[in-house]
Amino acid sequence: KPFHLVQFAMMGDAYAKYILGKDEPRIGVLSNGEEEGKGNELTREVHAILSETDLNYIGYVEGRDLNSGEVDVIVCDGFVGNVALKISEGLWETIHAILRWEARDNIRAKAAYFLMGRAIRRLEKRLDYSEYGGAPLLGVNGNCVICHGSSNGKAIMNAILLASNL
């Protein structure tokens, strides 16, 4: 329901302000384009409602904005959000596997991979889900962090640290 997604935007705004320290979090609705009228009935209704709020609503955002830093809170329904999250989680694994494969038989590529080590580790910290551990379940009475079903020890530890800071 549109009302639920508007509530998600409000909770995301509060989380970004009070936990992430963002003064005016930029909020967007995930859609298939940034142009007016894009999306399905649900996203168009949510867009119309959020446009009338005091939130710093910037309009529709696309999948490419998930990790861009251009938006602080991306609003979508749970199914779409879960699919987007799983794509993002797989991104690092895919990039890392391709880099290793390409460096396998080529001495120049191996040298470049070695020289890029620090940058690759920084990229991994940004894209590896275990670095974050989990995501807070907002709107419940208490602290709750949801972890990936295949979380490793590092992810669980980071989820516990996240929960302790909520």
Language model: regions and residue ranges:
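Glycine-rich phosphate/diphosphate-binding loop of Rossmann-like nucleotide-binding domains
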Residues: 2-63
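A generic short-segment signal for beta-strand/edge and adjacent turn/coil regions
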Residues: 1, 28, 42-45, 105-106, ...
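Solvent-exposed alpha-helices and their adjacent loops that cap or buttress functional pockets
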Residues: 19-24, 48-52, 65-68, 126-130, ...
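Glycine-rich phosphate/nucleotide-binding loop
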Residues: 70-74, 78-166
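Glycine-rich, charged/polar anion/phosphate-binding loops
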Residues: 13-15, 58-70, 79, 129-132
